[in-house]
Amino acid sequence: MSLAKRFVHLRKASPSFCLRGIYFSGLSYDGYREKLSRNALLHLKLDEAVDLFGEMVKSRPFPSIVEFSKLLSAIAKMKKFDLVISFGEKMEILGVSHNLYTYNIMINCLCRRSQLSFALAILGKMMKLGYGPSIVTLNSLLNGFCHGNRISEAVALVDQMVEMGYQPDTVTFTTLVHGLFQHNKASEAVALVERMVVKGCQPDLVTYGAVINGLCKRGEPDLALNLLNKMEKGKIEADVVIYSTVIDSLCKYRHVDDALNLFTEMDNKGIRPDVFTYSSLISCLCNYGRWSDASRLLSDMLERKINPNVVTFNSLIDAFAKEGKLIEAEKLFDEMIQRSIDPNIVTYNSLINGFCMHDRLDEAQQIFTLMVSKDCLPDVVTYNTLINGFCKAKKVVDGMELFRDMSRRGLVGNTVTYTTLIHGFFQASDCDNAQMVFKQMVSDGVHPNIMTYNTLLDGLCKNGKLEKAMVVFEYLQKSKMEPDIYTYNIMSEGMCKAGKVEDGWDLFCSLSLKGVKPDVIAYNTMISGFCKKGLKEEAYTLFIKMKEDGPLPDSGTYNTLIRAHLRDGDKAASAELIKEMRSCRFAGDASTYGLVTDMLHDGRLDKGFLEVLS
């Protein structure tokens, strides 16, 4: 008979059926008892539990309520709360009286099933029968309030518990704390702890740990640090887990000095840091470029016989590799292996990235070969890093070969993969292959993002394919994807370089209607376009508008206007602009100095002007 059928059969069994069963089964049947031993209950299966309950309700006299509670508790641990509730109801129908323990089990199961009103009804019933709720009862109800989004009632219940003389335990506090954090009530969680202290109901280490952990997860390390200090004033000593949690949070939110101070404080108190503490600090110091401090911490860690793990080494290797300190990164890699710590995909990717960033593609490929030989399979990040390295080195054909190798390994390229290849082909002035990769991307079901479109538009414009760029741009505007300021700047620059300054100006003027604020590049592009067309007045008018309500002019703005006036022989206007530029702490750029030098040679300028510029 299936579990479902046995359950239905059991529900249909009436008291009279059970009484008739006495005649056949005898009054003294107690074979169920051995099945209720602690060891048997640990290995009890659900269908066996259903059968066992059936045996128990057919036995005469009925098993004791203690024996029923053992079975109900075992089923509750299986998380079969509905079955516990049903069996509890069946017991009442048969006249088996519940005790406080079984009422607690029932209330807990009802709360777990979000049937809080029924749980409260049972509470009322048990109190009428003279059973006062225990801390277990109230904790179950508290959990029900929290899961039922009735968090204010949960807080009120704890306050009421204290007033009634109950001593909230660790379960009480941690249940409510987790509920408060789930409902984004971090300040209420802190206030709860402080209120309980005032009422003489001191939360323990576990409760403080739960609040501090919640604050850290929410990105509030300052509040966590403040609570840690209050906790220690209350004579509750924090352990390494709490210190490490706060240190890690301080590190993640860039409070590196506070993290180091807390590390020193825990050390002075004799609380031994663990590998997690060290790894958090080392990673943070590496992110700040403080490699010597990070290395010192690693040395300190080794002196204390605290074994670094792969995370510790990865942080240092990644930092050194990015800064071009590749010898140091390789030494750390060798030390990892000497310590029998297996490098993982993150380790290899960091080294490959470092070598690619510093144009050492041969070594990057060697690391790639090594990781494959060690059965550490490369992922999309590995391939993207190598493809980008080859594309930057103008070796886009090698990048495409890597892309094919990636496919052979069953890896699907992502948006970054295709965008990198598109950019690489455009850099090599290979517009056909760039567009081919874009088409393949779409046919492979990989969705281009705005960066992909910007790369495509920029490549087409810079390679003199403005008409094709316009087709893509018009499609983009009709799609659900919103062009950004970079998109408009690319198109504006493409139009101006193609001599279509009026079209560029129309696009610039449309930005405010599209809700896009022009940036300094947008202004500089149009000012440069006007200057190349000989439209100095329009360029200067835009320059004034820029100073009044746009982004402030930068070095590029001034140098573009200075060169335009110099080419027209307007030395006075150029000198005035140079004076203004220098007051803004900008200097002449290479193009301006090149133009001035040429004009000095052919006599259009005297040496005094060079002094003005310098």
UniProtKB/Swiss-Prot annotation:
InterPro entries membership: Mito_RNA-Proc/Resp, Pentatricopeptide_rpt, TPR-like_helical_dom_sf
GO cellular component terms given for this protein: mitochondrion
UniProt xrefs under PROSITE patterns: PPR
Transit peptide: 1-7
Subcellular localization: Mitochondrion
Domain of life assignment: Eukaryota
Keywords: Mitochondrion, Repeat, Transit peptide
Repeat region (PPR), residues: 64-98, 99-133, 134-168, 169-203, 204-238, 239-273, 274-308, 309-343, 344-378, 379-413, 414-448, 449-483, 484-518, 519-553, 554-588
Main location: mitochondrion
Family designation: Belongs to the PPR family. P subfamily.
Listed NCBIfam families: PPR (TIGR00756)
Name the record gives this protein: Pentatricopeptide repeat-containing protein At1g63080, mitochondrial
Organism lineage string: Eukaryota, Viridiplantae, Streptophyta, Embryophyta, Tracheophyta
